[in-house]
């Protein structure tokens, strides 16, 4: 099993020193879901929400969150992201919204946390915008789908 990289020999948390690492191309994809009543989902799809376009707002929130992950998650490095994409899909069969994020850069550390943060904050934004209509929406699961690049190479979730 791998060692925890953010814990030093005395058990203290610290930010990993990546100064000696080579810059490589890295990408990560994550997903999140927001479950809701059919009426709430229909309101979003039909654009009837009094606060405006729920998907557009959630997309922008996810993008902004990815860019600020280092301010939200302790010990994360500030990264120069070259791509952040957030896609939202209404899944009427399951009464939910599926969010998929993709983050990319050329750098010394991975972008998994940025992708996970983008998907999570997009989901939280949907909840925030729709909570007046439905308070019992369910967020989750949230998970990493794929990681490309870095020392550990390629990871992809099995479907």
Curated annotation (Swiss-Prot):
Substrate binds at residues 75-77, 113-114. GO terms for biological process: Mo-molybdopterin cofactor biosynthetic process. Its EC number is 4.6.1.17. The keyword Lyase applies. GO terms for molecular function: cyclic pyranopterin monophosphate synthase activity; GTP 3',8'-cyclase activity. Disulfide bonds: none annotated. The active site is at residue 128. It catalyses: (8S)-3',8-cyclo-7,8-dihydroguanosine 5'-triphosphate = cyclic pyranopterin phosphate + diphosphate. It is an enzyme of class 4 (lyase). The keyword 4Fe-4S does not apply. Pathway: Cofactor biosynthesis; molybdopterin biosynthesis. NCBIfam families: moaC (TIGR00581), PRK09364.1 (NF006870). Catalyzes the conversion of (8S)-3',8-cyclo-7,8-dihydroguanosine 5'-triphosphate to cyclic pyranopterin monophosphate (cPMP). This is Cyclic pyranopterin monophosphate synthase. It comes from Photorhabdus laumondii subsp. laumondii (strain DSM 15139 / CIP 105565 / TT01) (Photorhabdus luminescens subsp. laumondii).
């Amino acid at each position: 099993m791998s060692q925890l990289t953010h814990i030093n020999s005395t058990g203290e948390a610290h930010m990993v020193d990546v100064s000696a690492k080579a810059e490589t191309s890295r990408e990560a994809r994550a997903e999140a879901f927001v479950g809701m009543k059919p009426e709430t989902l229909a309101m979003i799809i039909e654009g009837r929400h009094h606060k405006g376009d729920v998907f557009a707002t959630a997309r922008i929130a996810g993008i902004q969150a990815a860019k600020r992950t280092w301010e939200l998650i302790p010990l994360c490095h500030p990264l120069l992201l070259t791509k952040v994409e957030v896609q939202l899909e209404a899944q009427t069969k399951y009464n939910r919204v599926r969010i998929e994020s993709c983050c990319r850069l050329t750098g010394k550390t991975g972008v998994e946390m940025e992708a996970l943060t983008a998907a999570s904050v997009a989901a939280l934004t949907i909840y925030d915008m729709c909570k007046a209509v439905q308070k019992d929406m369910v967020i989750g699961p949230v998970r990493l789908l794929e990681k490309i690049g870095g020392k550990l190479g390629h990871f992809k979730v099995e479907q």
